[in-house]
Amino acid sequence: AKNELVDKVVKATELAKQMAPDVMIDGEMQADAALVASVGASKAPGSPVAGKANVLIFPSLEVGNISYKLVQRIAGIEAVGPVLQGMAAPINDLSRGCSVSDIVNLVAITVNQAAAK
């Protein structure tokens, strides 16, 4: 697909590959190709991560937020995030619908981010 959001992911992938050449990074690819081996083999043959991706990068905060909330609610799992990276200081965002557990988890991550600075 060709659009502005896809172009953002392509550029981010290229930049990430330059910054971390020893890390297996690939993209842009659809979520099913990134997560399901049989789909990855047909949609992204030759990709080192197709079907076994452990990090997904979204083109915007909004898209990432929608995606993680869908997975959290449909699968009935505990999800922590969104975790923001690349800021001058540790900062993360809590949803108005978050639980006490969500707050504790994200505070712990933010404290670890601050300690690493």
Walk through the language-model features, giving the residues of each.
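Glycine-rich, charged/polar anion/phosphate-binding loops
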Residues: 37-45
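Solvent-exposed alpha-helices and their adjacent loops that cap or buttress functional pockets
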Residues: 17-18, 46-51, 82-86
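Glycine-rich phosphate/diphosphate-binding loop of Rossmann-like nucleotide-binding domains
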Residues: 1-28, 32
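C-terminal functional extensions of proteins
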Residues: 11, 15, 37, 62, ...
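Alpha-helix capping and helix-loop boundary segments enriched in small/acidic/polar residues
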Residues: 3-4, 44, 94-98
